[in-house]
Structure formats: C-alpha cells, structure tokens
Amino acid sequence: MNGADLIAQILKREGVKILPAFPHSDLIEAASKISVRPIIVRQERQALHIADGYLRATGGQSACATTVQHGPGSENAAGALAQCFADNVPLLHLPGGYATADQGVSPNFSAARNFQHISKWCEAVHRVERIPQMMQNAFAQLRNGKPGPVVLEVPHDLYTQDADPGLIDQYRPQRRSTPCADGSDISKLVDRLLAASAPVIIAGQGILYAGAADELTQLAELAQIPVISTLNGKGCFPENHPLSLGCAGLSRPDGVVQFLNKADLVVGLGTSFTRSEYITPFPRAGRTYAQLTNWEGDIAKDYPIDFALIGDAKPTLAAAVKELCERLGTSGRRGNS
C-alpha cells in the first residue's frame, strides 16, 4: 500500500463513488482499482464543475472528491473552487502539491496557502502517517456546519511513498451532526408565524442540503404561508404547489414582488439572505425578519434580522411542525396568506 492507495481506501469508506480528475495524479489509478470511478476531464475547472453539479443534483447527500495535478493544474482549478465556495457546495478537493522537498520554494504554487479564502477549510498533509487524521478532519469539516468546499493538498511524492497497511484501521468515517435549534426559540418562531397577517417564507439551499423539503411543505401547509425559493434553493418547494410563489431570481413571477411588498413577516429558512444582483432585493422597512441558519456568520449579514435561530433545518422544522399541529390540529388553519 502507498499513500495514494490509502487515500483511495478512505474515499471509498466515506461513500465517494466518482472522482472527477485531471491527470497526472497517482490517486486516479488508486481509485479506479477499488471501483471509485475516475472521470477524466479536459481542463481542471471541469472536474470541479462536474462535482459541483453532482452534489447539487443530490442535494449534497452524496460525497464527491476531485483531484488535479500540482502546480498549474491546481492553479487552473481556482475559478471553479471559488464558485463552489460562493454557492456553499460541500466538495472535497484534493489538489496535488509539489514534492515535500520543494515546499516553500518560489514560485512553486501552494494550494494550502492560496485557497484559504475560497474554501471552508484548507490544509496540507506532509507525512503519509498523517493522512488518516487529516482526511478524517477534512470529512468532519465537509459534513458539519455550513456547507462549503474543503481542500487538502497532497504533495505528489506522498502518493508513491509506502504506507503501513495498518494505517487504514486508524480511520474513522465521519457522520453528519444535525443539531436542532433551541426549543424556546422554535416556540417563539411559531408565535410569530401565527401572529403575522401577511407572512412569507424564503426557502434556501439549506433546505435541500438538510433534506428538509418535506418538513418545509408541512410547515407551509399547516400555517398556510406562501413560499418563495432562492436561486440556489430552487426545487426545495414544489412550484406547482398552491402556496408556491416561485423563485426570487432576477427574472421572477409577479407574485414574488407583490407578496414581498405586502409582507409583515419575512422568514428565511436555510438561507443566508445574501444580497446579489441576481436575486430579488427584499424590502427592509416596515416588516420583521426571522432567519433559520446553521451558521452564525449568516445572521444579519446583509439584512436586519429581528429574530434568529441556529440549527439544522430538518429537525428544527420538524419541531416547528409538531408544535403547529399541537396548536392548530393536524389540519392546520383555514385560508391562506
């Protein structure tokens, strides 16, 4: 076993099925030997774009890794990595690095140093025996908290170095933790939902990544609240549903603007409320904003937030649905907003 075999075995243990890649990387052959399918691309960015699309299509529920050659290969992937970072895509990127003896020699490119600001977590591994621990840390970052790309740079000479077969036994697959928001905060959110005369829900990509589409639908139906999806959240709420107003993109249905303008409560669920020229701007004055997010850095980032909850969307919305059923009955309230 060598370093490439060790990393490939870890990827398989974590459920990685495809490895979009640009040669040369010894990880490509190591992965193919154990049925982790390499997808060879013609330009480095394409590897990350393939993984990006795959992860969005599966709602972030599948694991996916990418690899490219060190130096120019790693540099060429930067634009696609920045896109994944901007859109919170939970991708594991394993760029090659210069040999350990050449680290820190100018102008050799270091992904670990240069990708710090376009990734959620960015490190390098320098010894074969550290691979299990660094990969475990990488997957823990990948699976928990706010989604985003995780980068682990692997010097190319580590791929061919001998690795003790017992190292794989040190690896512990990482699970996703789904903390629920505080119970009293959930009750206060339900109070606000029921007290509002014209509430609107803004549902984001966090609903998809949490697998909380069913809970969102139940909440909207019980409280009879119309739902607008963000661009990245498109698909989290069925657009043929009577309570769907459509997507709040730059091009949007008239109902999106009409309901936002008359809303007295705007509730963001699984969204960062990020301002963008591609997203419908939300009115600020004369309304209350509530937000459910799994990362405190999203709160009041671009909009004034009156009430925030921190937690995973699925258990938090499930608890809100349970409380609504207790207050309103399983049929919910009559009429709609």
Where are these regions (language model features)?
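N-terminal alpha/beta PP-like core and its mobile active-site loop of ThDP/TPP-dependent enzymes
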Residues: 1-332
